């Protein structure tokens, strides 16, 4: 089998590091880009170069932006008393897509993990405590993933914020809309039973 030239192989290897792309998918993507250089590859390379120099973290919340403050933090119509804490920007974007939250966000940049040696100082937890003190936050909503590390992080944050007196809530967990009980794991069913409400 013929090997691709070294620079193309390097591009394939780099593409394969992206989530959802394995070596075969990366190879197909690179071949498509090479086939459509003018329409796909050149504009993609230019956009990536621009984003590499302009993208940065919002100094207030940690969202990705190309200014000091992101559009959400600059939006004066957002509720200033509600702060939704998320693990990463992808979670923030998912909540924004849903359109159900009109407050502000705080992106941690990960979760606590003894296995990966990630402690509170590696995350934006100290900055979260500062924001609660300085911005007059009345409610912190913990929208962290229902993993062991996510729940450990949620409990840690609740303990850190307890002296401030701020109300700390978390997202409900349970049966997804359209979900069938037979297909759900025991933990999800248990969480749904514990979070039940009057019908």
Swiss-Prot record:
Gene Ontology molecular function, alphabetical: DNA binding; zinc ion binding
Cystine pairs: none
ZnF locations on chain (C4-type): 58-73
UniProt GO BP: DNA recombination; DNA repair
Domain of life (superkingdom): Bacteria
Xref: PROSITE patterns: TOPRIM
Keywords annotated in UniProt: DNA damage, DNA recombination, DNA repair, Metal-binding, Zinc, Zinc-finger
Domain Toprim: 81-176
Function recorded in the entry: May play a role in DNA repair. It seems to be involved in an RecBC-independent recombinational process of DNA repair. It may act with RecF and RecO.
Family (UniProt): Belongs to the RecR family.
Protein's UniProt name: Recombination protein RecR
């Amino acid at each position: 089998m013929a090997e691709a030239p070294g620079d193309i192989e390097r591009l394939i290897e780099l593409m394969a590091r992206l989530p959802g792309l394995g070596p075969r998918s990366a190879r197909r993507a690179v071949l498509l880009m090479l086939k459509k250089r003018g329409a796909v590859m050149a504009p993609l390379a230019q956009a990536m170069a621009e984003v590499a120099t302009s993208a940065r973290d919002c100094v207030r919340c940690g969202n990705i932006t190309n200014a000091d403050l992101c559009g959400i933090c600059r939006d004066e119509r957002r509720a200033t008393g509600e702060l939704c804490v998320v693990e990463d920007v992808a979670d923030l974007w998912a909540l924004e897509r849903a359109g159900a939250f009109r407050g502000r966000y705080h992106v941690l940049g990960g979760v606590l993990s003894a296995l990966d040696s990630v402690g509170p100082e590696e995350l934006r937890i100290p900055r979260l405590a500062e924001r609660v003190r300085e911005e007059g936050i009345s409610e912190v909503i913990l929208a962290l993933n229902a993993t062991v590390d996510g729940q450990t992080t949620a409990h840690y944050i609740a303990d850190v914020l307890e002296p401030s007196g701020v109300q700390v809530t978390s997202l409900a967990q349970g049966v997804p809309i359209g979900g069938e009980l037979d297909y759900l794991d025991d933990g999800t069913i248990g969480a749904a039973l514990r979070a039940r409400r009057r019908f």
